[in-house]
Amino acid sequence: MFIQWGRRFFALFWLLISVILFSSYAYAEQGDKEAGKKIYEVRCLWCHGATGEGNGFAAQFTNVRPRDFTMGVFKFKRSLPGQIAADEDLFRTISNGLPGTPMPSWKLVLSDKEIWNVIEYIKSFTDIFESDKASGMVDYKGEIPYSADSVNKGREAFKKAKCYECHGENGRGNGMKKLRDDWDNREWPRNLAKPWTFRGGNDVKDIFTRVTVGIPGTQMPSFASANGLTEKERWDVANYVRSLVDETKRPVSPQTVLRAKYIKATLPNDVNAAEWNETPSAAFKLFPQLIENDKLRGFRPTNDSVTARVLFNEKEIAFLIEWDDRTKSVPGDPIVEKLSEGEVFEDAIAIQLRVGPPTAVQQPYPGHGDKTLGVEMWYWGTGNTSGGQTIKMIDANGLGTEKRRDAGRINIKGTGEYKAGIWKVILRRSLTTSNTHDDFQFERDVLIPVTFANWDGSNGEKASQHTLTNMHWLQLEP
């Protein structure tokens, strides 16, 4: 009897310890508002503003507007649909941050107690927490394990709920709807192929939560209503969404070298040729180009990465550059003009190479080079409805010094295709040219500095207002 009781005691004891140590759920604590105010004024005021209206000085430069606390509406929560956010929801957001936004993770800077103090102060910006309280949380007991069967059922439920109208048939966010949130900010549907950009978490439970609760203040509704999806269907949709991940779009570390593959055959002209599938790829994160005066204000890039593959033979080199883009931006196209906030420019991509000996390892400034180290850029654009695709060759020694050269004279060729929310563009040229002074000469087994620049024309991007990668290394196989 004593032995049985002892076993039960220790089993319960270790169960309790496991819950305490490994649970990701934070239980609410009563914070100190005055202590939270002091932290807020040092850490949070610059974006969220002195009165919590999301209008701090830095807000004008952010790609996603800071939360307006005075409305009491919080996007990412586990409290039930129609209920206000629970304190635990605010704790989770402050602790983990929101990927793809200026909201950082604070858990390595602030203690749990300090975060609870900040929450208590944030809640004082509205009286909604005085009269209301979350009374229930999303229940995960009915979770359906990930399987091919669940994914297939989720695909059908995705269609049933018409998720494709915003997220697109393949989940790339290219549903061609013009969306605005409750603060009248332009919103773009989430690209479901990039779960690392999901702001409220990206495991199956997190996705189930978003489908169940929705995202308050946005066009993303709750599908838990009577005419929405059943609990089982929502779990299947969550598994289906998780299956859409495209790992070739996940940005690599800055130290990653882009490897160019050698083939004896003629280089492919088709962006979907089988040779590209057998070529190493690397995805690079895009950053806003720093531009002068007040142009940076309100510039909120929509494309966040490019993926590159490179093939070469004895005579030529070819780059296949791929990126997800919610719109095919062609000036003069009435469909994309309805989606845009202003004038539509061409979608475009450019490769930037340093001018000079291939064996030199100095890196020029990623944005159009600098006075010391010049660059050449191979530019491809969509053109407009009355003309063909644009191909340019540009030399530069810094912003404002660009000089265009005839791309045809050095035999730069390009072609592009847009399909299901994805651009694929090939740019190619001979490995060497007769103009060794002005043209970059490719050599094998050396590190070559390379940068990629991207323009989303429906987002008002043109000239120096665009995104670009950091400088990375390209190496042709020895």
Which role fits each region the language model picked out?
Residues F61-K107, D112-I122, L179-R242, E346, ...:
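Extracytoplasmic electron-transfer domains, predominantly the class I c-type cytochrome c fold
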Residues A11-F22:
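Bacterial N-terminal signal peptides
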Residues Q30-G49, Y146-R172, L179-D184, V237:
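Sequence/structural segment immediately N-terminal to covalent heme-attachment motifs in c-type
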Residues V271, E316-W323, W423-R429:
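Short, well-ordered beta-strand segments enriched in hydrophobic/aromatic residues
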Residues V257-Q289, P334-K419, K462-Q465, N470-E477:
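Extracellular/luminal beta-rich ligand-recognition
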Residues R428, T436-P478:
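Long, compositionally biased interface segments
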Residues Y25-I39, F129-K159, T248-P254:
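Electrostatic cytochrome c docking/interface patches
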Residues V306, K315-A318, D324-P331, P358, ...:
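Primarily extracytoplasmic ectodomains and periplasmic/lumenal surface modules that are beta-strand-rich
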